[in-house]
């Protein structure tokens, strides 16, 4: 799962990143195109990383601990695998040849060739740059989903509460990619305010049905720094999760479900200096000269998600060892599985 995650995340900062550098030469058109091209991977990351916070409404006993190691995958809807190129949306970017349906980063191979046409009305000249549209990484993946591994430590608190901490140290790749995660969540029991009654011996009955509320915040820093130049891509993702949880908890098994809300914010900055060579032509298509242009820090992009979510899952409990899995219905459905340890 870790290898799969690195392939998906770092592909847009390293190998596939080089494919759409030429887009930056299209001035303001670049932000529109790159936003559409990269949107599914960032939306998927926000949904995937904001999952798997809880596996029961029952809080951990005060000052006891639970360690969960899980992996989530946000499945990319088919309509996010490509986008239609509408010439009216762009000032300089055009299709040279090929279909106007262009793959996103989570799509397949591209069959489209693009061109940038910048007219100079004063001298009746045009600047022309041609290149292949970037392709996607769908064929490199076992399933078309954006993955997100997570390690979470939880501690029980007094008053029927629990705190969750997520942390991933900075992961780096040989080509300059990096990733770091930090998140915190709090769960509070609602069912504790409803008495369960007493048995025939005067002892409190065992509670099997539990209700709780949970809130969480998470931040991710990731990106790519070219070790041989000043080029870089820096990504920051912040997410918020609010949910109500219900669970049936028995000695060996917990069945849980939740209904909640997800909110996410993402920024991506493309930094550095990029040089481009234009073929300058007259209005009849005759070559006049080659002109080189430099562009610095070409992109600052913003993405956001918000919406309701509903989840169902189970947890198998074997002494101190646990196995859990669940599925969340939302814009990008998320499947989660993992193991846990209680101590």
Give the location of each predicted region.
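Repeated loop/turn-to-beta-strand initiation elements of outer-membrane beta-barrel proteins
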Residues: 76, 160-165, 193-197, 252-255, ...
């Amino acid at each position: 799962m870790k290898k799969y995650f690195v392939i998906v995340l770092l592909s847009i900062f390293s190998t596939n990143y080089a494919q759409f550098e030429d887009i930056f030469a299209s001035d303001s058109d670049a932000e529109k195109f790159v936003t559409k091209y990269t949107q599914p991977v960032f939306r998927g990351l926000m949904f995937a990383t904001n999952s798997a916070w809880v596996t029961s409404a029952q809080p951990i006993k005060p000052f006891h601990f639970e360690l969960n190691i899980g992996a989530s995958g946000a499945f990319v809807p088919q309509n996010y695998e490509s986008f239609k190129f509408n010439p009216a949306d762009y000032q300089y970017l055009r299709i040279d040849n090929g279909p106007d349906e262009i793959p996103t980063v989570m799509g397949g191979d591209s069959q489209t060739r693009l061109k940038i046409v910048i007219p100079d009305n004063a001298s009746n000249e045009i600047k022309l740059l041609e290149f292949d549209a970037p392709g996607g990484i769908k064929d490199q993946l076992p399933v078309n989903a954006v993955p997100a591994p997570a390690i979470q430590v939880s501690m029980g608190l007094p008053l029927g509460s629990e705190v969750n901490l997520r942390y991933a140290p900075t992961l780096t790749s040989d080509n300059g990619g990096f990733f770091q995660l930090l998140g915190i969540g709090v769960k509070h029991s609602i069912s504790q305010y409803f008495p369960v009654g007493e048995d025939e011996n005067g002892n409190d009955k065992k509670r099997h049905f539990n209700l709780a509320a949970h809130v969480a915040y998470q931040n991710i820093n990731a990106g790519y720094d070219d070790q041989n130049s000043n080029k870089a891509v820096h990504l920051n993702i912040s997410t918020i999760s609010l949910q109500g949880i219900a669970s049936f908890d028995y000695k060996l098994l917990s069945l849980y479900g939740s209904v909640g809300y997800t909110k996410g914010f993402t920024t991506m900055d493309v930094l550095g200096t990029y040089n481009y060579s234009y073929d300058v032509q007259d209005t009849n298509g005759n070559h006049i000269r080659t002109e080189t242009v430099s562009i610095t820090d070409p992109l600052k992009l913003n993405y956001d998600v918000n919406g309701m979510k509903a989840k169902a899952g189970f947890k198998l409990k074997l002494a101190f060892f646990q196995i859990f899995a669940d599925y969340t219905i939302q814009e990008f459905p998320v499947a989660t599985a993992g193991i846990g340890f209680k101590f």
